[in-house]
Amino acid sequence: MHLAYPAVLSALLFCTGLYGVLARRNAILVLMSVELMLNAVNLNLVAFDVWLSRAAEETLHSGQALTLFTIAIAAAEIGIGLAIVLAVHRNRGTSDIDKLRDTAEGHEPDGPDTDTPATGTAAEKAEATA
């Protein structure tokens, strides 16, 4: 098998994952897209390991060992990421990245703040309540 086939498939998977990271607003879908990108890198590592071992006539399998390490790191990353998304969803009620960014910056997406009146100073407010 030629090196071009897994390399093209890896590039397509990586581009699909990159599109998902840039276009999706749901945090879980973004995590899934990151995992797709990591799997594309893993495919590329194994393909180049097989190609280089045939060219050098050695069997070091360093690409496969690195792929196993990457899979272990990706499993830990997805576990921690899903735990964070679940905690944020319980606290904020949404997993939409734009809405989370707006609430973190203190912006009210519903409209103007109703706690402060539009006119009047502190002295006028004190006289009005007395």
Swiss-Prot record:
Reactions catalysed according to its record: a quinone + NADH + 5 H(+)(in) = a quinol + NAD(+) + 4 H(+)(out)
Record-annotated membrane-spanning stretches: 3-23, 28-48, 68-88
Pfam family, one: Oxidored_q2
UniProt-annotated location(s): Cell membrane
Its membrane topology: Multi-pass membrane protein
UniProt keyword annotations, A-Z: Cell membrane, Membrane, NAD, Quinone, Translocase, Transmembrane, Transmembrane helix, Transport
GO biological process, alphabetically ordered: ATP synthesis coupled electron transport
Biased composition (Basic and acidic residues): 97-110
Ranges of compositional bias, category Low complexity: 114-123
InterPro entries, per database record: NADH_UbQ_OxRdtase_chain4L/K, NUOK/Mnh_C1-like
Principal place of residence: membrane
Signal sequence bounds: none
Superkingdom classification of source: Bacteria
EC number: 7.1.1.-
A molecular function GO annotation: NADH:ubiquinone reductase (non-electrogenic) activity
Span list, region Disordered: 97-130
Function field: NDH-1 shuttles electrons from NADH, via FMN and iron-sulfur (Fe-S) centers, to quinones in the respiratory chain. The immediate electron acceptor for the enzyme in this species is believed to be a menaquinone. Couples the redox reaction to proton translocation (for every two electrons transferred, four hydrogen ions are translocated across the cytoplasmic membrane), and thus conserves the redox energy in a proton gradient.
Similarity-based family: Belongs to the complex I subunit 4L family.
Protein name: NADH-quinone oxidoreductase subunit K 1
